[in-house]
Every structure is written in structure tokens, then in C-alpha cells.
Design a protein with these regions (language model features):
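Mixed-charge, low-complexity intrinsically disordered regions
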Residues: 1-80, 91-170
Length: 170
């Protein structure tokens, strides 16, 4: 079992425990009741543990990126779908994939901004395929940030999974 799977399991366990505690609080009179005060410290501990585990999951999922995996090259507001084509101890090399926008997507515009504002940009969906001629990026692991980064200042973040996005409003 990958470490990320073990972390996901632990997060689900905490969520279920929290749901049970909240159910107990409702049965015992709701928030402000002696039961809620009794459980408050435990709920706080669970929140902090879950937050810590979510961070660890983020780091592990990024660390587990391997050759052949899909990833996303996040620019400031646009994102490019890519594939990992090489991995070393401290770097991954990724290549831009061919992303084809669904013909069903039709941008909806309203007046505003410089000329108009696209109100449904989040509805974009794409199909992906490898592009052996796609642009290549070398990305370095950032221990501090827990992810691979690129760009001269490290401002470009690499995410897990393929996600193309075009910001029509920028």
C-alpha cells in the first residue's frame, strides 16, 4: 500500500469519528450543551490532525509522481496537462500533452472587464493524449513546499493528475 493510501484511510477514519461525535452532540442537546463542551477539545484535536494529514497526503501524492503519470503544469491562471517522462531523485521531466476542448463547451459572455467576462469557464472539459512533440519542462522537488516546481523563481507548481484550463478572463 502506498503511503498516500494509508494517509487517505486515516483521514476517512477521522471524518467518521467526527461525524459520530457531532451526532452525539446533537442527541445531547446541540452546541452549547455540556456534551458539546466535553467534546470540543477532542474535535479541535481531530481538526488539527486532519489538517496535518491532508498536508502529508498532498506531499506524498506529489512525491509519488512517476514516469507515465499525468500531471498539471499550473501557470498563474492557466493550466497545462502533461505527462511525466523522466524522474530522478530531485527532479521530474514533464512533457505537454495534447488537450482537446470538448465541442460541447460554449463560452458564455457578459459585458465587463476589458471587453467581456466568461461566466462558465469552470465548465471546460478536455480529452488528453500524449504528444511526443510537446514542450518539455524540468521541475525540481521543493522540500519546503512539498511539490515539484518550475520557473526561474519556482513559482510554477506541478500538480497530480491532468487538468487543462484556459482562463478566458485574463
Amino acid at each position: 500500500m502506498k503511503l498516500s493510501e494509508a494517509i487517505k484511510f486515516e483521514i476517512e477514519k477521522i471524518k467518521n469519528d467526527r461525524k459520530n461525535i457531532l451526532s452525539e452532540i446533537r442527541k445531547d442537546g446541540g452546541y452549547g450543551s455540556p456534551a458539546s463542551i466535553k467534546y470540543r477539545e477532542r474535535l479541535d484535536e481531530m481538526y488539527y490532525k486532519e489538517t496535518d494529514l491532508e498536508r502529508k497526503l498532498y506531499v506524498e501524492r506529489n512525491r509519488e509522481l512517476d514516469v507515465g503519470d499525468g500531471c498539471t503544469y499550473h501557470l498563474w491562471s492557466d493550466s497545462y496537462a502533461c505527462t511525466v517522462i523522466k524522474k530522478t531523485k530531485k527532479t521530474i521531466t514533464i512533457q505537454r500533452d495534447k488537450a482537446t476542448l470538448s465541442p460541447d463547451f460554449k463560452p458564455e459572455w457578459i459585458p465587463g472587464g476589458f471587453a467581456a467576462h466568461c461566466t462558465n469557464a469552470e465548465d471546460q472539459s478536455y480529452t488528453y493524449e500524449r504528444n511526443p512533440n510537446g514542450e518539455i519542462y524540468v521541475c525540481h522537488w521543493s522540500e519546503k513546499q512539498g511539490c515539484y516546481r518550475s520557473g526561474s523563481d519556482g513559482s510554477i507548481i506541478i500538480g497530480v493528475g491532468r487538468h487543462e484550463y484556459y482562463d478566458y478572463n485574463f
